[in-house]
Amino acid sequence: MIKIITFTIVTSLTLALLGCASSKQPTFGLELSSDYYEFIQPDFARYVEASTQWLRENRSFIGEDKDIELLINSPFQLVPTEQTNKAALLVHGLGDSPFSFSDIAKSLVNNGYLVQVLLLPGHGSKPEDLLLPSYADWQHIVDHYTSLLTAQYDEVWLGGYSTGANLVTINAINNEEITGLLLFSPGFQTRTPYLEKLTPLIASVINWGYRTEETNFARYNSVPFNGVLAYSNSASIVREKLTNYKLSVPVYVAVSEADSIIDPDS
């Protein structure tokens, strides 16, 4: 979904400056809001249960097989066959779903890691729900389930794609208990940072950046500007922290040199 950020900002800039619409402000502490569900749970199993129930009742299903769509979009955990002291938490990107980490999660569990894959608030149900969360909600869920893992396992790796990579990097900078990072196309900075700076202005007056028919079971085709704003906030914060602090853990980074949106040199 990050790949449409530039398009949505450019096409909506004129309307934004005219102030032709108003945006619903995201609620801090979304897990306590009547608009959403309690995604902060005392353990991961109850989180998966609460998330799946929310999706079952609130997802705008695309096809006839609702069970498959629920499976694709729900957070999940993979447990290795033998007892382990190693764990990994994986976080998807803007507009995406836990399904994006299905292959990597299988590889990690086959190498002896307990693997947990999050569903970021606002995802998996319908694009309109991305009008609800803020960056703080996304960081809160990552920090919470990371803390549960570090309390139980000696070795904890965090992995993320795009926006998810920003969130786990921010946690690792502040968390001495993290063993290492797995970053896939980290969204530290786009190739058009001057357009990224306009996101707060546009998000304050326009709800939708790009809206179209939803045809993909595993990710949104449409994106509200509130979701783009949450990404932009994560990018600004991770850049600031990386300027002032150095990571002291191993970091694996995978990024395409030809990426049209993310700056591979950032």
Regions found by a protein language model. Give the residues of each.
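C-terminal motif of bacterial Sec signal peptides marking the signal peptidase cleavage site
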Residues: 18-19
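Conserved alpha/beta-hydrolase "acid-adjacent" motif
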Residues: 260-265
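Gly/Ala-rich beta-loop-alpha elbow adjacent to hydrolase catalytic centers
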Residues: 160-164, 168
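A conserved short beta-strand
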Residues: 177-193
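Short, surface-exposed "cap/lid" segments of acyl-processing enzymes
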Residues: 71-120
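Catalytic nucleophile-loop/oxyanion-hole region of alpha/beta-hydrolase
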Residues: 125-152, 157
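The alpha/beta-hydrolase serine catalytic core
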Residues: 34-67, 188-243, 257-258
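Short beta-strand/loop motif that positions the catalytic acidic residue
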Residues: 247, 253-255, 259
